């Protein structure tokens, strides 16, 4: 496995390859990330995993400085899976003119709702780094997790709007035995908080079951927020949306997605669950 620390190294390596799949990450890899890599390896012999904690997608009071960085352990895990290369650029290689002067990618209509409303500029940072990685690595395939469902849809729209020659593949959320979605930020939780945090997924499941008989979305959302509050969360949002474009749900939608973000202590957790509308024609 090659460890490519600069754009120049990456480009020299890339010239020697044919098809390549990319798995973009910020490191501190867990089993959810490794499942993305396994999915990519099923589709492509040459898999590149990028590890870059992207400062553009962090807000002023977020956890950029404290975000866990475990590069050595990450590389060992990726080498064991048979990854071809790991791309670990420095900030000045990715943003040579600095963040303030960097050209940015905006995906309108989807970037300023839900997580985008709570984290202004976040999805601009995500879209910009992913677009740059696509240009740097030039993959035919890129694999992302569905846990970050809004992020996945932002990237899909960006690829569509900019006519990028990349297939974007979403893979199912990997979960702990409790149902808690795997996340690097779970490491911030105490043992007790992890136990409490499992209520987030349980609330999503309960809401999914209720949707089969009740499409009063506002009522369901309010009940879910109350349940999360009683479980020790501070809810950010709990929203039922059209799964395709993340606009407000209607009873006629063929598929919904229930999205939630809530704080457990100081840790912000997100999760989602897709629901097929059996009544849709």
Swiss-Prot record:
It catalyses: (R)-pantoate + beta-alanine + ATP = (R)-pantothenate + AMP + diphosphate + H(+). (R)-pantoate binds at residues 57, 151. The keyword Lipid metabolism does not apply. Homodimer. The reaction proceeds by a bi uni uni bi ping pong mechanism. It holds the Pfam family Pantoate_ligase. Transmembrane segments: none annotated. Its EC number is 6.3.2.1. It comes from Idiomarina loihiensis (strain ATCC BAA-735 / DSM 15497 / L2-TR). It is found in: Cytoplasm. Pathway: Cofactor biosynthesis; (R)-pantothenate biosynthesis; (R)-pantothenate from (R)-pantoate and beta-alanine: step 1/1. The active site is at residue 33. Belongs to the pantothenate synthetase family. Keywords: ATP-binding, Cytoplasm, Ligase, Nucleotide-binding, Pantothenate biosynthesis. InterPro entries: Cyt_trans-like, Pantoate_ligase, Pantoate_ligase_C, Rossmann-like_a/b/a_fold. One of its GO terms (biological process) is pantothenate biosynthetic process. ATP binds at residues 26-33, 145-148, 182-185. Beta-alanine binds at residue 57. One of its GO terms (cellular component) is cytosol. It is an enzyme of class 6 (ligase). It comes from the Bacteria. Catalyzes the condensation of pantoate with beta-alanine in an ATP-dependent reaction via a pantoyl-adenylate intermediate. This is Pantothenate synthetase. GO terms for molecular function: ATP binding; pantoate-beta-alanine ligase activity.
């Amino acid at each position: 496995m090659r460890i490519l620390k600069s754009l120049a190294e990456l480009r020299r390596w890339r010239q020697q390859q044919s098809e390549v799949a990319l798995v973009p990450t910020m490191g501190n890899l867990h089993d959810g990330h490794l499942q993305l890599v396994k999915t990519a390896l099923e589709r492509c012999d040459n898999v590149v995993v990028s590890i870059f904690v992207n400062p553009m997608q962090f807000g002023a009071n977020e956890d950029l400085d404290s975000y866990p960085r475990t590069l050595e352990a990450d590389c060992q895990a990726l080498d064991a899976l048979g990854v071809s290369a790991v791309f670990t650029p420095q900030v000045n290689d990715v943003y040579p003119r600095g963040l303030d002067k960097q050209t940015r990618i905006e995906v309108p209509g989807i970037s300023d709702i839900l997580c985008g409303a709570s984290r202004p500029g976040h999805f601009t940072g995500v879209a910009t780094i992913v677009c740059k990685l696509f240009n740097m690595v030039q993959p035919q395939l890129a694999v992302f997790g569905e846990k970050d469902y809004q992020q996945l849809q932002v990237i899909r729209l960006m690829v569509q709007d900019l006519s990028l020659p990349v297939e974007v593949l979403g893979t199912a959320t990997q979960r702990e035995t409790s149902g808690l979605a795997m996340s690097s930020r779970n490491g911030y939780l105490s043992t007790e908080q992890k136990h409490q945090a499992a209520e987030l997924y349980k609330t999503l499941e309960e809401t999914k079951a209720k949707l089969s008989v009740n499409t009063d979305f506002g009522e369901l959302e309010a009940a879910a927020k109350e349940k999360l509050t009683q479980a020790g969360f501070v809810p950010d949002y709990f929203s039922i949306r059209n799964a395709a474009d993340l606009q407000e749900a209607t009873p006629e939608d063929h598929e919904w997605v229930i999205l939630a973000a809530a704080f457990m202590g100081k840790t912000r957790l997100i999760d989602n669950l897709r629901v097929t509308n059996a009544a849709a024609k």
